[in-house]
Amino acid sequence: MSSVAAEAVQQRRSGFRERLDSLTAPSGLFIAAVLVIMALPVTRTIQDPDFWWHLRAGQLIIQHAGLLGSDPFTYTVANHHWTMHEWLNEVLFAVEFAVGGLGLIVLVLCTVTWLGLLAIMQKARLRHPGRGALGIGMLVAVIAGFPIWGPRVQMITFAFAALTLLLVERHLVKGGKAIWGLIPVFLVWSNFHSGFVIGLGFIALVLIAEVIGGWLHMPDPAPRERLRPLLFVLIASTAVSMINPNGPTILLYALGTQTSGAQQSLIEEWFSPSFHDWEVLVYGAMLLSLAMLTVFNRHIRARDVALVLVTTALSLQSARHIALFVAASTPVYIDQLALASPRMRAALRRLRRAPAPARTRARGQPPLLFRLTACTLLIAGLAGVYVAWLLPKMQLQPDSLAYAQEFPVCAAQWLAGAPEPLKIFNQYGEGGYLAYTLSPHGDKVFIFGDAALMGDPLLYTYAGVETVTPSWDASIRRAGTDIVLYDINTPLADVMAHAADWTKVYQDGLSVAFVPTDKLSTVHLPPVPVWPPGSVCARQAKAAPNTGAQNQ
């Protein structure tokens, strides 16, 4: 018995030593470096204009101890029913903000995004690619997703989608009971974001692809006996997703977004990616190289074909869906890269007319202590770089200069001093920040970023004003607007600056405000501010030192 125990101990020691050797080998250090480097592009300041109204909505949910049945932010669609499909995420935003400010929210969302990337890497590892292909593929994917990374609600769906695909692939490859873990995942996901229907769609797509792939005798099909549990998981996950304050209607909510002509044609994040933008070029290169690798290898699984084709179509339709392309297609890209590597090396040798490398005696590795020290120093150095990259993002406050250059921070500070609530016609992407800062004062905005709540008619009305159609003035006045706050150097601002029946009352380096001339005596505004030298707004206002504003 003692000899058996000693042998078991020896095997454990041997296995531990092998893992250490593997982790401290050059390829292991490369993967460790990739894991840290992946965190850099996804760690950014808050750039999503919708973040601010999500935060305020979460504060109101806590304040009212329940979901909001109608719109609290606008004076245009206050009677519309509000389907708060992101209520749990909004509540967490409010709690995190109360505990740790914006810094904690940035940290949590960036960590969630990194965990989604880790799930993608784990799915790719199920096919045992070389570490070179794994690391290179992940780096390409992270750069390809650069246009959409950052602290935003959609990263929750990205991470859950990556986790769903990992568990599905693990089940098809290895079997086991882990697939049933998707049921609680969808219970939570459906209360975080309506994007959970994407996860359900991925499972259904894999099931259909495997059935069709079996008929077509495509390579590496999943065992048929593993498809039935996956079908049961899909049914159960669909059922538990309806355990939600919105009930079964949550399943239909996302379809309204996908079928809205106004949202698809008017909202920038729903536009197709522009390949004239340098940020999109790596995504395009990844897409093109994936197609070339697939043709070169002539070997791809049915479920991989389905996932790549569907997410490619979605990402070409809308830039925001590049995240889904990265989640679904990166493991396929890595697999194709690994399949192509030996053939590409052989082809290069033939071009050089060089013989295959002769087998040589393996060189001994440096001592383990040396390798552990090098590994520790590398990881510590990269971690230090990441912390130096992260901390400035976490330290920014809502009224910092970085945000004042993107959002109407200074104009909101000015309007907050108004003695009475105002009805503000605003830029679509700035409605969220204005709702966050001014709704506690009773001010209302014309529009903000929940396009489904706004409805297509209001979106088209706003688009008509933004593009200065002949009815722009009537549309603003008909809504009962008190003041227009818009970005400088835009068509609307330029037209209003030359309109006799509109008076400019405020301007800073980002925004300009106008009041109908016939309302100057009835709209009570705060005095034009004089910002202290060196303040955030003084530095921002240097772009427009002479406002020419009139304020009664």
Language model features with spans:
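Membrane-interface alpha helices of multi-pass inner-membrane proteins
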Residues: 38, 141-145, 179-194, 236-241, ...
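Transmembrane catalytic cores of multi-pass membrane glycosyltransferases
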Residues: 62, 194-298, 332
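Transmembrane-helix motifs of polytopic, lipid-linked glycan transferases
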Residues: 107-127
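Membrane-interface transmembrane helices that cradle and orient dolichyl/undecaprenyl
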Residues: 164-179, 289-296
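Membrane-proximal, lumen/periplasm-facing interface regions of secretory-pathway glyco-
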Residues: 348-417, 429-431, 442, 451, ...
